[in-house]
Amino acid sequence: TTVGTRYANPEKAEVFELGAKIALPSGYLNIAIFDQEIDDFQTNTFVGTGFVLANAGTQSADGYEFDLVYSPTESVDLSISGLFMDSLYDSYVGAAPGDLSGTVPSNTPDDTISSTITWNYNISGWDSFLRISHLYSSEAKLLENPAHQALLVAQGNGFRKQDTLNFTAGFVKDNLSVTLWGKNINDDEFLTAAFIAVADLSETSFFGYPNNYKTYGLTLNYSF
């Protein structure tokens, strides 16, 4: 299909993956390498007065991923997972801003890592835990239109990069559970998405969605 048509063709994917599942004395490790190619990759494209569903010619991605869960002691649990990939529009001739063949799709970081450490303990008869998690993704551009992306970069908002810390502390005794939690405790700030304002003839106004701000909370549960 071309930009502006009502319907998009279905995607056709070809994926090669080779992996292993490894049992550890106190955990496991899953690893895999992959190489995928998607013909008629479906993407939302801005056409001046709105967005339409369009097909890129071919989009490919290759890389590797892993998932590790390990308990070094009876009271400590560790988990870390990661995805490392390179993605590319091999062919995208009919894009709204022109030929995007050879460019990287928006919002596709090369590296994504999630890690968690949990300490389990008992205090005064309360079964308790303390968990800290970290979410990281490397820098990724927000827009695919090179001219629009350049405008955002000039204002210091052209890329998203995540480096977020969360924590949870839980206490359970009999029928009562108490959970204290904090999200984005390091006050990480980034845009999750950005797009040009609809019907802006100058094409210089943009909107964006910020990530969730620092939040704390307390949750109480009682079962009876």
For the regions a language model picked out, list residue spans one by one.
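Hydrophobic, lipid-facing positions within transmembrane beta-strands of outer-membrane proteins
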Residues: 4, 14-18, 52, 62-66, ...
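Transmembrane beta-barrel outer-membrane domains
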Residues: 9-13, 49, 56-61, 71, ...
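Outer-membrane beta-barrel translocator domains and adjoining extracellular loop/strand segments
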Residues: 1-4, 41-49, 85, 89-98, ...
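C-terminal beta-signal and adjacent terminal beta-strands/loops
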Residues: 135-145, 171-224
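Membrane-embedded beta-barrel scaffold of Gram-negative outer-membrane proteins
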Residues: 9-64, 83, 87-93, 189
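Extracellular loop and loop/strand-boundary signature of outer-membrane beta-barrel proteins
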Residues: 2-7, 15, 49-55, 95-105, ...
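Gram-negative outer-membrane beta-barrel transporters
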Residues: 35-37, 54-145, 219-223
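Strand-connecting loop/turn motifs
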Residues: 22-28, 63, 73-75, 110-112, ...
